[in-house]
Amino acid sequence: MVKPIVFMIAIVMVGVIFFVLVIPAEDQLMDSWVSTGPNITLDEWREVFRLWAQFGIAVALVAALFWFLCGQWIFGMTRWIKANNKRWVWLGFLLVAVLAVVPGMVLTPAVQEWGRLAWVCYVVNNLGLFYLATLLFSPSSFKYVPWLAMRVRYW
């Protein structure tokens, strides 16, 4: 019973790494590349960027935790051959993480230069967090469901 709790803590730690390290690094990148217009200052724009980046990471983290909870305690495993059928569920949670990018894309104010770089950051954050968390810490019964997990995961 200890291993699932450790895996859930590890998933949360991946999310914390994204909150603590990735968003500030992207914020500095935006500070040096993005050029705003007369309607909004760079500090206001960066504040909006950080808000929507944090929102996307939170949604991706919740999706990864729900995948773990479903795989560990909800899905019944009677045949190992049928474990790969849950890939559609994993793809559904991945879709939730991807769709969390949309509010940031729509509600981040337009800027004069390099504004679309925020979109790239939103997508990389959400996909990176969800994929890494599920690749490394999926439940044992479904640990090979994420793509390329057979090449990475040996525990």
Report each predicted region and the residues it spans.
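Alpha-helical membrane-associated segments of multi-pass integral membrane proteins
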Residues: 7-8, 106-155
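Alpha-helical transmembrane segments and their helix-start/interface "positive-inside/aromatic belt" motifs
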Residues: 1-14, 76-92
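Membrane-water interface at transmembrane helix exits
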Residues: 19-30, 66, 70-75, 108, ...
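N-terminal signal-anchor transmembrane alpha-helix
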Residues: 1-62
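Alpha-helical transmembrane segments of multipass membrane proteins
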Residues: 14-19, 62-66, 96-100, 125-133
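Hydrophobic, aromatic-rich alpha-helical transmembrane segments
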Residues: 1-5, 44, 48-53, 82, ...
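Canonical alpha-helical transmembrane segments
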Residues: 54-79
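Hydrophobic alpha-helical transmembrane segments of integral membrane proteins
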Residues: 80-115
